[in-house]
Amino acid sequence: MIEGVSVKELRSNLDKVGLTLDIWGDENPPGPLCASSCRMLFPGMLEAWVSRREAAERITCLEGTIKLVLCDRREGSPTRDDVMELFLGEYRFREVTVPPGVLRGWKAVGGRALVFLALEGGGADALFLTPEEAGVPYDWDIVMQ
């Protein structure tokens, strides 16, 4: 596990009218001065690599399945250069918090589009890197077995 990354299982309730998913409760409210976005990613598409300079990013997949890959590029971190792969989505609702300085990429896996929320804290300026600039030792073509 990369230092500073947290993975929280989210509580869901399925009843006769639908599904309720508790995302940001009293114990984990979104912070002040934050930006949020709801995104859709088409099947097989990926976006990599991005790092937040000053703020953490919280990611929750609402529909479909996302492969989230993280790489620690922080100077002095005990987990520097570690790579972490997570799958989240409608079969396993989770919120992943990615600290500043950790690169992240994501890919829509499965046969349909995915919908996810991203919440960035204040100062959410992003650094976008090409695969060559990022130099992350990860093969996106590897599939979950």
Place the predicted regions along the sequence by residue.
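Non-catalytic, conserved peripheral segments adjacent to functional cores
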Residues: 1-92, 111-145
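Short beta-strand His + acidic residue motifs that chelate non-heme Fe in jelly-roll/DSBH
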Residues: 96, 104-109, 117
